[in-house]
Amino acid sequence: MSKVFHTQNLQFKKIEPRLPEFIWNTSPRFAKLADSKHLEFDIRSLDPGRFSFPFHFHRASEELFFILSGEATLRSPEGFQKVAQGDLIFFEEGPLGAHQLYNHSDVPCVYLDIRAMFGIDVCEYPDSGKINILPFQEVFEINSKVDYYKGEEQVASKWPQEIIRKPSESYIG
């Protein structure tokens, strides 16, 4: 079933995170209203002098911006460039798809943000050394990376002793 969203009189909700540099405005979550299974999409408005999300990339999601009005400066691995009304910007998965917008102008920059979502995504923030497990919003520092088997040394102690064989009883094949 098709869903039509009339955006002429769109009401934005202000999102005010802890750092004022990242205040932005968003439309309703159109993807939820459409019951979308693999796309997230909404319209965002970035006020003058504000940054979009911190510089980041997705490990399991592609993203697409379409600038509806205004202009901003895009930061990507290629450097900095101005984007304006009518520009379509694609961000691939991984470090080469890293991105961030800054509204350098005197008017809001309004853009459609479309993201492919196929389950869990890991969003990485190169500037601050964090990862974010999406959609759960669980944020961790990258430098806390550990060996896969860390803390598993006592695995047998979690099992009933009558089930566990002594190492000398182990099968050697």
Predicted region positions:
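Short acidic-glycine-tyrosine-enriched beta hairpin
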Residues: 77-94
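A generic structural motif
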Residues: 52, 62, 69-71, 78, ...
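Ligand-binding loop in jelly-roll beta-barrel domains
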Residues: 93-121
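Short, conserved beta-strand element in jelly-roll/cupin
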Residues: 43-47, 58-74, 114-116
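A short beta-loop-beta micro-motif enriched in histidine and acidic residues
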Residues: 31-39, 50-63, 79
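Conserved short histidine dyad/triad with adjacent acidic residue
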Residues: 24-27, 42-58, 96
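Active-site donor-binding loop signature of nucleotide-sugar glycosyltransferases
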Residues: 48, 85, 116, 127
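A short, N-terminal "cap"/entry segment at the start of jelly-roll beta-barrel domains
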Residues: 1-38, 124-173
